[in-house]
Amino acid sequence: MKPLHLKLNNFGPFLKEEIDFSKIDNNELFLISGKTGSGKTMIFDAMTYALFGKASTEQREENDLRSHFADGKQPMSVTFEFQLNNRIYKVHRQGPYIKEGNTTKTNAKFDVFEMVDGKYEIRESKVISGTQFIIELLGVNADQFRQLFILPQGEFKRFLISNSREKQGILRTLFDSEKFEAIREILKEEVKKENAQIENRYQQIDLLWQEIESFDDDKIKGLLEVATQQIDKVIENIPLLQARSKEILAFVNESKETAIKDYEIIEKKTLENNILKDNINQLNKNKIDFVQLKEQQPEIEEIEAKLKLLQDITNLLNYIENREKIETKIANSKKDISETNNKILNLECDKRNIDKEKRMLEENGDLIESKISFIDKTRVLFNDINKYQQSYLNIERLRTEGEQLADELNNLIEGLEKVEDSIGNNESDYEKIIELNNAITNINNEINVIKENEKAKAELDKLLGSKQELENQINEETSTLKNLEIKLDRYDKSKLDLNDKESFISEIKSAVKIGDQCPICGNEIQDLGHHIDFDSIAKRQNEIKEIEANIHTMKSNIAVHNSEIKFVNEKISNINIKTQSDFSLEVLNKRLLENENALNNQRELNKFIEQMKEEKDNLTLQIHNKQLRLNKNESELKLCRNLITEFETLSKYNNITNFEVDYKKYVQDVNQHQEHSNQIEDKLIQLSQRKLIEQNNLNHYEKQLETYNNDLELNEQSIEMEMSRLNLTDNNDINEIIAWRGEQEELEQKRDTYKKRYHEFEMEIARLESLTKDKELLDSDKLKDEYELKKGKMNTLIDEYSAVHYQCQNNINKTQSIVSHINYLNQELKDQQEIFQLAEIVSGKNNKNLTLENFVLIYYLDQIIAQANLRLATMSDNRYQLIRREAVSHGLSGLEIDVFDLHSNKSRHISSLSGGETFQSSLALALGLSEIVQQQSGGISLESIFIDEGFGTLDQETLETALDTLLNLKSTGRMVGIISHVSELKNRIPLVLEVKSDQYQSSTRFKRN
């Protein structure tokens, strides 16, 4: 990501400000300079806020970014343009604020644009989705951006001095290692779940084992005393338990079967005695009831006499009823004959009227026949009347169109002949164009090589001059440095170290007196006077310091010039002078012009020929289409003429409308005549059928009357014969007998009931006498007592057997469940062993006491430290190297950083470094971190870095080394910007972004020193 343009409105001290980063040439190192509080860091805040909606430091909130001097009606906004992977983007973020006069907050806005074909096209227009788009585009979030692109105050050395837990948070964010922690948690939960399942299965086994019935049997109790944790012993005891349970069940079953047999014997004996007792009682009762039934015998005999008489008179009564029915039928037949004769007379009258109507209709038959003939002949015309009518309408139009098409066809043919004459024998020559293009390309390449070589030679001469000038300066500075070192060597430094010696000597003098033994040398003190000229020594010390400062300045200048020579040498090595043509630029340009003219002429000729061919093809196509249209016109015109001729010949009409009206009228007349004729025929047929039906009915009624008269005569004869047989003289005798018929059913039922009961008593008494014959009745009370005793014993043993059988089966089921649980538990422990081991390893229970996440983070930290040491070795003159502290505890250590001092060959805590050494280490570590993150992430493009930290803690030599490091970053294609108050940087860095403040707002400008 490389900044291009930054626009700030009401942001911090900037009310309306624009910064054009495109003024920075070739990723030049530049300094951001200004007074304290002028808003230098706010530039970093603006870029971070534009991208992520956050400041460059976590401590600064969004509300702190709005200018206190902003117009209450204007929003705070930042517009940031940047380049990423050769594509240009623009983001515009407006912060939320309460507009002056309002009580509700105006919402934030965020738009993301991408430049396409020189214009910006919007990609996102919502705050949340837009910010997510930027995170995915850059490949980093706000925290990662602070670590990789912008190193703000307070953040620069945080990674270096942080403890393991703090580094874990930073590295977790940068390398997205939370997924490894998630794996650990998943495995932890999986193990926890598996352990719970295993424990639950142990509990189920123990519960089942405790529930096994012992039957109060000592052997079973002994087997059940085994603890369920002894799984193998439990498996061994289960068959023994089952065998002993079967033995107990068999013993109880044998007792039960004996009791059942005893019960069945007494039950049978009791049942037989009860049956005998019931049979004797029933026999006595039936005999008494039978005697009472026989007393009804006289009444039954009287009933049978009445029923016999009723049976004998039945035929006579039937004949009397039949006579009444026959007389009714005769009367009905006479009535039907009279009504049928009247219907026949009415039908004959209706037929005469319809015959008259038919004769009137037949008088118009000839006229209707002529109309039917016309309809049959012209029906085909009427069915397609639209076709013929359209022919009358189209014939004139088709004549006109045909003449017009013929004229247009002749014109097109003439045009085609002219185009063919223009083309002649000419053909397009594209091979010649290819040859000319190749020749032009080759000439342009030769011209470009000559121009590039001239430019490269000029650049080489300039660089060689700069190099020579730098070498001369280095020679002069080296000579001056040698003179200063010679001058410095002339001083005896061993006698000039006066740090605290003067006060130390004064303290010794105050503690001793003349004659005492010296605590330093052990000799007797002879004199306490002054023997050292401290003023002279101090003067020489100042001279030495001045020389050492000059030496340091010379070394710094030499280092800077050596770095510049190195940079110039790199540029010289990158200059490539290619082999060029023997021809001069003038000759090549002349040949280029000739080929370009020939190319243009050939292109014009090809273009003209192609246009003529295209016009020829177009005319040919038009002629073909016109000919098709003309042929179609002639065909349609011929068809219209044939249809009109056909219509007029068949119909004898020359007007479609008149024909259509007459045809419809004829059809209507014919249909009406036909319909009327059909109606008359239908009526005649119906009348004939109805008359025939009535005639048949009349014959039927007459025959029926004759039959009824004969039946009546025969029935009278039968009545006379029956009365004679029954000795009945008149109807009174008959009526008396008829009165008994109402009681006949009751009398028959009474008789039948008597006979049925009489027979049943005979049968039942005979049966009971056979059952009780030769049998003795026993004492019922004694039998009952014995029965109850045997039954109680049997039920008790059955219940006991059922309980024992159920408990045995239950024991079998439980032991089977126990075996199943144990088998599943063993398999589960075997299957999950690898998961348990893996969970322990990733949780830190391993030989390194590291969690999986910390193991990964240590791997990345080792890579970062290795990359950082490449630069730290240069900056510290091969004295310091960063090392990772190897001592670890359970999962949370191993990320601390110590420094290894190659001078003392020992490692020490990072806090023992001086301010300048800490800055060097922090810078090297930050650059190493950014490079490793870029290597791992792939999609992150680190084209710029901004630093706001610590240059004031560096001495001159260290400052020069740090600048060399940053210059090397620039040579890798990265824009480097730094914030500092160090005056030497203003002299060393030619490009400065100056931030000025006038108390209430700030402004910026680029300037060169």
From Swiss-Prot:
Could you list this entry's UniProt keywords, alphabetically sorted.
ATP-binding, Coiled coil, DNA recombination, DNA replication, Endonuclease, Exonuclease, Hydrolase, Nuclease, Nucleotide-binding
Q: What does this protein do?
A: SbcCD cleaves DNA hairpin structures. These structures can inhibit DNA replication and are intermediates in certain DNA recombination reactions. The complex acts as a 3'->5' double strand exonuclease that can open hairpins. It also has a 5' single-strand endonuclease activity.
Q: Which PANTHER family match?
A: ABC TRANSPORTER ABCH.3
Please give the coiled-coil regions recorded for this protein: 176-208, 264-366, 392-501, 535-638, 664-802
Which Gene Ontology biological process is one annotated for this entry?
Answer: DNA replication
Gene3D superfamilies listed in its UniProt record: P-loop containing nucleotide triphosphate hydrolases
InterPro entries (UniProt xref)? P-loop_NTPase (IPR027417), Rad50/SbcC_AAA (IPR038729), SbcCD_Nuclease_C (IPR053380)
Q: Recorded GO terms, molecular function?
A: ATP binding; ATP hydrolysis activity; endonuclease activity; exonuclease activity
* Subunit architecture: Heterodimer of SbcC and SbcD.
Positions that bind ATP? 34-41
Cite the SUPFAM superfamilies for this sequence.
Answer: P-loop containing nucleoside triphosphate hydrolases (SSF52540), Rad50 coiled-coil Zn hook (SSF75712)
User: What protein family does this chain belong to?
Assistant: Belongs to the SMC family. SbcC subfamily.
Protein name per its UniProtKB record: Nuclease SbcCD subunit C
**Which Pfam families does the protein's record reference?**
AAA_23, SbcC_Walker_B
